[in-house]
Amino acid sequence: MVTVEEVRKAQRAEGPATILAIGTVTPANCVNQSTYPDYYFRITNSEHKTELKEKFQRMCDKSMITKRYMHLTEEILKENPSFCEYMAPSLDARQDIAVVEVPKLGKEAAQSAIKEWGQPKSKITHVVFCTTSGVDMPGADYQLTKLLGLSPSVKRLMMYQQGCFAGGTVLRLAKDLAENNKGARVLIVCSEITVVTFRGPSETHLDSLVGQALFGDGAAAVIVGADPTPAEKPLFQLVSAAQTLAPDSCGAIDGHLREVGLTFHLLKDVPSVVSNNIEKCLFEAFNPLGISDWNSVFWIAHPGGPAILDQVEDKLGLKPEKLRATRHVLSEYGNMSSACVLFILDEMRKASSNAGLGTTGEGLEWGVLFGFGPGLTIETVVLHSVPIKPGPH
């Protein structure tokens, strides 16, 4: 007779969860940040609000964003004028777009990750799908499974309405799934489009306007598994993962799904809430490893906005190059909510390889990945890089 302990031991992987492939994708429609205020105020019939437009122009200029990608084109917005008002009932029309386009964009990212992974998709045992854009039953996890032609017995987990910290959450969940199910290969997909949050400007709700200046569309997919086979190419190991609520931060970042879509609320002190709590998170994550020099690790931080990055850098005394990959993704794509940190992981391993550095983490051994979002919730993931094998010259 087999004991429960023996079954349990046989179910568990031996090594740590490892990222085996990363895929990223954006919609084709690209918007230039420098000309976006003109476009935004024109398309929302708000050009008469000259002072507000000047404020928005300053927000865009300070955003450190060069360009963003958006599924919502001028044509779609002209067909849906309610999207362009500040508070017009429009949820049905927004949902109709989101429930189709979110899984579709996710599928493209997943196909890219599966191609890099190089293994048959039949080996995918779990799917974790994450979005803050649109809700349906069965969900985007089901749609993705159908679009990719995955096994009907794939184990699915659907995460809705988590927001900007969720890129850390999905890695934490994938780590537990991979390490507790021997041979598991977990496909994570974060797919975000601004169709639920786009709206016209309001003089009385400047926090909503901040969102219009920052958010962009994108999807990222990651394959996670423990005990890689010789045919698989490890990129990063997931060493530990934690989630915490920052004290006294209730209401700092809120989103509410209403008839008008997803409304976004942000308090001015979000950057200070994050920067005041980040050192405690770092200490708890790295103290067991004997690491206390925050410049000795590589950094992947959710780029909520430039003020958050500036204050974190200042508070921890980080060298400017520590947040290079993070700032690069913010500049090239804007804030894509949960997908951002996965884009930064992709950027970091590619830049590390191109620069001839020794590891996937900018030549360093240990790293940290942070997600910040509603709650205020902080996700902290400790990463271990993988040596980069020099390619043929």
Swiss-Prot record:
Substrates-to-products reaction catalysed: (E)-4-coumaroyl-CoA + 3 malonyl-CoA + 3 H(+) = 2',4,4',6'-tetrahydroxychalcone + 3 CO2 + 4 CoA
Organism of derivation: Ipomoea batatas
Catalytic residue list: 164
Ribonucleoprotein as UniProt keyword: no
Gene name tied to this protein: CHS-LF2
One of the record's GO molecular function terms: naringenin-chalcone synthase activity
Coiled-coil region(s): none
PROSITE patterns for the chain: CHALCONE_SYNTH
Protein name: Chalcone synthase LF2
Pathway: Secondary metabolite biosynthesis; flavonoid biosynthesis
Protein family: Belongs to the thiolase-like superfamily. Chalcone/stilbene synthases family.
Assigned keywords, A-Z: Acyltransferase, Flavonoid biosynthesis, Transferase
Enzyme class of the recorded protein, top EC level: transferase
GO process terms (BP): flavonoid biosynthetic process; polyketide biosynthetic process
Gene3D superfamilies for the chain: 3.40.47.10
One Pfam family hit: Chal_sti_synt_C
Its biological purpose: The primary product of this enzyme is 4,2',4',6'-tetrahydroxychalcone (also termed naringenin-chalcone or chalcone) which can under specific conditions spontaneously isomerize into naringenin.
InterPro entries assigned to the protein according to its UniProt record, in alphabetical order: Chalcone/stilbene_synt_C (IPR012328), Chalcone/stilbene_synt_N (IPR001099), Chalcone/stilbene_synthase_AS (IPR018088), Polyketide_synthase_type-III (IPR011141), Thiolase-like (IPR016039)
EC number: 2.3.1.74
